[in-house]
């Protein structure tokens, strides 16, 4: 784990910490499971035991983001210096996964969920080799001009994604992401907040769709990344690969 990258004054982090959130837990098959908690970083530094969760370790201690100029780096996969979780939650194909954010302040931007089949243990898979399939996406409601992030905020900072019923059983990583677009009018102004959770999928599905590497999801000049969100929109191209619905 690249812990040394976070050894800077905590006081400098306070404004950002108060502003953004992260996925602190999920509900799958109706069961709540805690995810990675920022406080665990301090436990690691202080050599204090902390709970093992299906949420991946990551080093965004300031609750910061991955900027467009980092889209080709491994940080876009599961956030900054992410490291595999050692345990997994479970969900049935056709069921739902509820992603619970600690908080969220920005009501402009899409919400997306991807899955990647580990092809074995998700605790040891190389994140750079994962191929991702987008199973959920939501942009803006053109009738109300309410963005998906606004809907998430109104729903107690929670988002629910349905697992395609035809998805083959296996060991998966779910990648849930908000793209904050309040700064999208300027180059490198979008903010990506990806978080990963190990979830085993059960069921009788047989579909194993081909995925793509996370480092190829987005470009800094994509029309859904660099544009003016402060006008009435009648169209919006959600960033990333095509949605797979099963």
UniProtKB/Swiss-Prot annotation:
Residues 1-19 form the signal peptide. It is found in: Secreted. Transmembrane segments: none annotated. Glycans are attached at residues 86, 141, 156, 235. Coiled coil: none annotated. Keywords: Carbohydrate metabolism, Cellulose degradation, Copper, Disulfide bond, Glycoprotein, Metal-binding, Monooxygenase, Oxidoreductase, Polysaccharide degradation, Secreted, Signal. Induction: Expression is increased 4-fold in cellulose-inducible conditions (in Avicel- and wheat bran-containing complex medium). One of its GO terms (molecular function) is monooxygenase activity. Its EC number is 1.14.99.56. It catalyses: [(1->4)-beta-D-glucosyl]n+m + reduced acceptor + O2 = 4-dehydro-beta-D-glucosyl-[(1->4)-beta-D-glucosyl]n-1 + [(1->4)-beta-D-glucosyl]m + acceptor + H2O. Cu(2+) binds at residues 20, 193. Its cofactor is Cu(2+). It is an enzyme of class 1 (oxidoreductase). Binds 1 copper ion per subunit. It comes from the Eukaryota. GO terms for cellular component: extracellular region. GO terms for biological process: cellulose catabolic process. InterPro entries: AA9, AA9_LPMO. Lignocellulose is the most abundant polymeric composite on Earth and is a recalcitrant but promising renewable substrate for industrial biotechnology applications. Together with cellobiose dehydrogenases (CDHs) an enzymatic system capable of oxidative cellulose cleavage is formed, which increases the efficiency of cellulases and put LPMOs at focus of biofuel research. PANTHER family: ENDO-BETA-1,4-GLUCANASE D (PTHR33353:SF34), PUTATIVE (AFU_ORTHOLOGUE AFUA_1G12560)-RELATED (PTHR33353). Lytic polysaccharide monooxygenase (LPMO) that depolymerizes crystalline and amorphous polysaccharides via the oxidation of scissile alpha- or beta-(1-4)-glycosidic bonds, yielding C1 and C4 oxidation products. Catalysis by LPMOs requires the reduction of the active-site copper from Cu(II) to Cu(I) by a reducing agent and H(2)O(2) or O(2) as a cosubstrate. Belongs to the polysaccharide monooxygenase AA9 family. This is AA9 family lytic polysaccharide monooxygenase D. It comes from Botryotinia fuckeliana (strain B05.10) (Noble rot fungus).
């Amino acid at each position: 784990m690249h812990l040394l990258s976070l050894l800077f004054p905590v006081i400098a982090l306070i404004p950002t910490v108060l502003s953004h959130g992260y996925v602190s837990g999920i509900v799958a098959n109706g069961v709540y499971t805690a995810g990675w908690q920022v406080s665990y970083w301090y436990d690691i530094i202080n050599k204090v035991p902390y709970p093992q969760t299906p949420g991946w370790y990551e080093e965004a201690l300031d609750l910061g983001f991955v900027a467009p100029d980092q889209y080709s780096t491994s940080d876009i996969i599961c956030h900054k210096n992410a490291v595999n979780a050692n345990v997994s939650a479970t969900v049935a194909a056709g069921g739902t996964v509820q992603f619970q954010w600690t908080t969220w302040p920005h009501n402009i931007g899409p919400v997306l969920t991807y899955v990647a089949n580990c092809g074995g243990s998700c605790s040891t898979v190389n994140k750079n080799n994962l191929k991702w399939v987008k199973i959920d996406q939501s942009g803006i409601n053109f009738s109300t001009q309410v963005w998906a992030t606004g809907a998430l905020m109104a729903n107690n900072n929670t988002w629910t994604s349905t697992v395609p019923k035809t998805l083959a059983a296996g060991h998966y990583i779910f990648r849930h992401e908000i793209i904050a677009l309040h700064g999208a009018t300027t180059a490198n102004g979008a903010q990506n907040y990806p978080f990963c959770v190990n979830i085993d999928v059960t069921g009788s599905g047989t579909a194993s769709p081909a995925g793509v590497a996370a480092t190829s999801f987005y470009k800094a000049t994509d029309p859904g990344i660099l544009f003016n969100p402060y006008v009435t929109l009648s169209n919006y191209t959600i960033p990333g690969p095509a949605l797979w619905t099963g």
